[in-house]
Amino acid sequence: MTPNEYQEQTHSFACYEKPISYENIGCQMITHELDWTYPALGLAEEAGEVVGKFAKAVRDESGNISGERREAIKKELGDVCWFVAELSTLLGFKLEDVLQHNIDKLTDRKNRNVIKGSGDNR
């Protein structure tokens, strides 16, 4: 399965309510429906769950990742992927383009010897 095929398939599972538009209550800062709210917050939550699995491995198993914990991490990584794909869809990006852009950025940083640096635009 390609990333774009994954994106198309996973979007069919997007069953969440979109918040009301602030436009109709007079807010000048935001004038569109916040379609991205749930997926953005969900991405943070799922990424936290991945980190939590590693934290418990450190706490409970001296950092070893057991087979059961490994499978639990795989499930959470899948959830992270769903939210990344959904946000990409809502923002009008093809997932393959997002992934290629990331490779291009990392390649450029590596070629300029700044991959270990700090900052988004290094």
Give a label for each model feature.
Residues 1-122:
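Flexible "arm" and connector segments at domain edges
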